[in-house]
């Protein structure tokens, strides 16, 4: 009888889908309830669409491996972005009708997640909400007090904790429904914070770390990650104790088995994944581990996949540098945290970096012209004022990295910097990402100036679109920092920070700045601006300040007619006629010389066109 009723109910669901969706959320939800399935939703709110959240995929994969096949539970992953409308995410979660919702929390999404935590209980009052991630692990008590409808927080490493929670929810269904012995059950689960029957927040001890090799590979369905960055983990923990960083808290450094790593990297190579970003905090902290992986990707290079690593440059040895120098241009890119060149600051934040060694190694890698190097500085660190930061900037800028990122101190809960904030006189924002406003050594006014300089560096250096012009312009100033400081002041003066600008607009502002800063030599910069402009693209809307192209139509026609026959410069254009070659290249007369820009063949590091001087 029960079976017949269930079948009839299912038929009613199929025949009356609209009515069921209106009254119960959706058809799938009703079907699951009839089958007595607990639906678990792991939600990630990413900063951008191209990002993926490794954490939620690892939680799901580990739980399924640990618990085995379980017909009474279904785990689904939903990834959103902070750029989506709030209502769109709210509605999507409601339609999925989860019994248990787990949300991955970070600096960049915690404000957004906070709004979800306020509204979701109103529309899904019976849903259990669990949070996890670095943003909630070290301040669980305050968060649970702020959001009374949140069931609990998974603190620290989450795979084993999440699996145990699912086991408990599955085995103790009746107990949880009746509300009996809940405190007793939760008290035995390591790595969680929860609210007991009296409303008091209980923080259990952190859970011992797991064997990293036990975490399943999560990218079998690689098609789900098309056009997105793949994040990969070959180690967890960090051997260092930088006071501003949460990674220093996890002292249990462990590595995934190298043979397993190779097998998984080969999967990415076979599938020609564009980029794999290692999330290891210091990838090269163990030389044999780094060497084996770098050797493997070098020997199995598919000519397409790029691998991104965060490294300590001063730890690189000659053997590693030699191997790196032999790699295909663009095979790897290195992110190197310098943070400061002030030795007092470096010591105070517990870094072991030797700036002289770091500079030498960055230079050695630079000479290979095959690796994109991304160097970081942090403004707002102890004992680093405005003048000192300017010196740190000049020191790092002189290393000529492909990217120089100016960041601002984030005072993270759980970090040593958070504990010492009062001692350092650090004033920071209450809202995430808890960015510095001022310190004993740096005023808020100076922070504003540094933010303006940061934008100038981003536009005129990191874009790689003004390299010839900026290299020459630097000689007009006492230092690179002064140059960007002056350019920022000019932007401020003409109110250019208040509006957005096109690429051509940035060139025009820079030209105006040149005419004001070095009037007698401004015209000398036109050639450099022209070169920079056409290195990246065959610009159709030519800026007025460049004047007319010195190459006439007849000269261009004669060149391409000859090139079609002889292939003197465009050797890789076999099969292309002169009309096609003309579309894919550009001829320009710069400083009296005829220059050919080839957009089919670009530098793998900079993206700039190949350039030939036409004789």
Model-derived regions, located:
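Radical SAM [4Fe-4S] cluster-binding motif and immediate context
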Residues: 1, 213-367
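Radical SAM enzyme core and accessory elements
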Residues: 5, 9, 17-25, 31-43, ...
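N-terminal [4Fe-4S]-dependent radical SAM core
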Residues: 38-40, 186-234, 606-611
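Glycine-rich beta-alpha loop elements in corrinoid/cobalamin-binding modules
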Residues: 39, 55, 62-64, 74-206
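A structural motif corresponding to the C-terminal lobe/cap of the Radical SAM core domain
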Residues: 45, 287, 299-302, 306-315, ...
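Short N-terminal binding/cap micro-motifs at the start of the first secondary-structure element
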Residues: 49-55
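Proline-aspartate-enriched helix->loop->beta-strand connector
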Residues: 97-101, 273, 401-402
């Amino acid at each position: 009888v029960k079976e017949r009723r269930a079948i009839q109910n299912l038929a009613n669901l199929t025949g009356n889908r609209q009515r069921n969706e209106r009254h119960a959320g959706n058809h799938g939800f009703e079907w699951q309830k009839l089958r007595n399935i607990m639906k678990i939703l792991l939600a990630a709110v990413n900063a951008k669409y191209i990002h993926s959240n490794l954490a939620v995929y690892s939680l799901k994969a580990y739980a399924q491996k640990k618990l085995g096949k379980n017909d009474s539970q279904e785990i689904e992953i939903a990834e959103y972005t902070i750029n989506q409308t709030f209502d769109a995410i709210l509605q999507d979660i409601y339609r999925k009708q989860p019994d248990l919702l787990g949300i991955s929390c970070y600096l960049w999404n915690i404000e957004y997640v906070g709004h979800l935590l306020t509204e979701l209980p109103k529309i899904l009052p019976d849903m259990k909400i669990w949070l996890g991630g670095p943003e909630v692990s070290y301040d669980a008590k305050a968060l649970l007090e702020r959001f009374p409808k949140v069931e609990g927080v998974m603190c620290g490493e989450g795979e084993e904790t999440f699996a145990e929670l699912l086991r408990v929810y599955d085995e103790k269904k009746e107990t949880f429904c009746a509300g009996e012995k809940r405190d007793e059950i939760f008290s035995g689960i390591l790595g969680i914070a929860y609210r007991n029957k009296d409303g008091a927040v209980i923080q259990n001890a952190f859970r011992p770390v797991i064997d990293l090799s036990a975490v399943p590979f999560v990218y079998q369905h690689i098609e789900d990650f098309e056009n997105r960055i793949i994040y990969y983990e070959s180690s967890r923990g960090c051997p260092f104790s930088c006071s501003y960083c949460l990674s220093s808290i996890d002292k249990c450094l462990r590595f995934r088995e190298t043979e397993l790593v190779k097998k998984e990297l080969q999967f990415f190579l076979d599938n020609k994944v564009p980029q794999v970003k290692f999330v290891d905090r210091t990838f090269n902290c163990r030389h044999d581990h780094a060497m084996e992986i770098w050797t493997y990707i070098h020997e199995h290079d598919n000519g397409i996949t790029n691998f991104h690593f965060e490294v300590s440059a001063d730890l690189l040895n000659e053997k590693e540098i030699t191997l790196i120098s032999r790699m295909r241009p663009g095979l790897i890119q290195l992110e190197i945290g310098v943070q400061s060149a002030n030795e007092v600051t470096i010591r105070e934040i517990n870094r072991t970096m030797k700036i002289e060694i770091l500079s030498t190694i960055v230079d050695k890698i630079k000479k290979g012209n095959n690796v994109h190097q991304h160097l970081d500085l942090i403004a707002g660190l102890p004992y680093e004022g405005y003048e000192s930061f300017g010196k740190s900037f000049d020191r790092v800028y002189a290393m000529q990295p492909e990217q120089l990122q100016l960041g601002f101190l984030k005072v993270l809960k759980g970090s040593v910097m958070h504990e010492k904030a009062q001692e350092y006189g650090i004033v920071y924002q209450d809202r995430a990402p808890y960015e510095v406003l001022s310190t004993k050594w740096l005023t808020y006014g100076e922070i504003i100036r540094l933010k303006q300089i940061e934008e100038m560096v981003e536009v005129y250096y990191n874009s790689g679109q003004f390299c010839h012009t900026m290299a020459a312009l630097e000689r007009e100033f006492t230092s690179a920092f002064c140059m960007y400081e002056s350019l920022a002041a000019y932007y401020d003066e003409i109110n250019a920070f208040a509006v957005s600008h096109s690429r051509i607009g940035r060139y025009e502002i820079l030209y105006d700045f040149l005419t004001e800063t070095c009037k007698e030599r401004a015209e000398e910069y036109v050639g450099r601006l022209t070169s920079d402009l056409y290195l990246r693209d065959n610009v159709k809307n030519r800026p007025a300040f460049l004047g007319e192209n010195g190459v006439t139509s007849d000269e261009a026609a004669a060149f391409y007619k000859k090139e079609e026959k002889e292939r003197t410069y465009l050797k890789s254009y076999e099969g292309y006629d002169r009309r096609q070659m003309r579309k894919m290249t550009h001829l320009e007369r710069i400083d009296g010389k005829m220059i050919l820009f080839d957009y089919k063949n670009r530098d793998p590091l900079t993206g700039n066109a190949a350039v030939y001087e036409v004789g």
